[in-house]
């Protein structure tokens, strides 16, 4: 793991001791989550902007932003302590490419148009698509980090679902919604 990702993991574990931002108690529990956040870089198309919905403790957005410093990331996180954590990360790590917005997706009003919309453990895929597609460019993609429950949430083609261990990555183009 690169040193910046190690710094992120260390800071998250420190904050977890008092703020319970994630279930991870040690680095060996957090490393697979960071690897999981980065895995889609192996198969998704290049992107220049990303909206992460329900950023929480920063997964997947922070590892992605650290690996792709040329990409603009907008992190939507309504909860105060999680937004404070994300702002702290921005102040101590080289994360000039992120903007943190303390709002729920349903309350976020913006002319924003991004190439990629990500989300991990937030809501059903159909809800996320319905509420966020207005922020996605016509040639953009949704990337949702899901589990086996994906098949109960939404119909998806084999070309839209990628598996790695217990994770299902749902990767769907906006164009295919029509």
UniProtKB/Swiss-Prot annotation:
The protein's name: Ribosomal RNA small subunit methyltransferase G
Gene that produces this protein: rsmG
The protein's superkingdom reads Bacteria
Q: Give the function comment from the record.
A: Specifically methylates the N7 position of guanine in position 527 of 16S rRNA.
Grouped into one coarse class, the protein's main location is cytoplasm
What are the entry keywords?
Cytoplasm, Methyltransferase, rRNA processing, S-adenosyl-L-methionine, Transferase
Q: Give Gene Ontology CC terms.
A: cytosol
Subcellular location as annotated: Cytoplasm
| Residues the record lists as binding S-adenosyl-L-methionine | 54, 59, 105-106, 120
């Amino acid at each position: 793991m690169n040193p910046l990702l190690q710094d992120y993991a260390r800071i998250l574990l420190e904050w977890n001791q008092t703020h319970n931002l994630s279930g991870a108690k040690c680095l060996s529990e957090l490393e697979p989550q960071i690897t999981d956040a980065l895995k889609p870089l192996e198969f998704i198309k290049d992107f220049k902007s990303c909206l992460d919905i329900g950023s929480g403790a920063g997964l997947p957005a922070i590892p992605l932003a650290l690996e792709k410093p040329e990409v603009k990331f907008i992190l939507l996180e309504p909860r105060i302590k999680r937004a404070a954590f994300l702002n702290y990360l921005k102040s101590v790590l080289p994360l000039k490419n992120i903007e943190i917005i303390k709002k729920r997706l349903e309350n976020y009003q913006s002319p924003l148009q991004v190439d990629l919309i990500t989300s991990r453990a937030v809501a059903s895929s159909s809800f996320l698509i319905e509420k966020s597609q207005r922020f996605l460019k016509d040639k953009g993609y949704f990337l949702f980090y899901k589990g086996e429950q994906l098949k109960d949430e939404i119909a998806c083609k084999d070309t839209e679902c990628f598996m790695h261990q217990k994770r299902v990555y749902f990767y769907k183009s906006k164009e295919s919604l029509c």
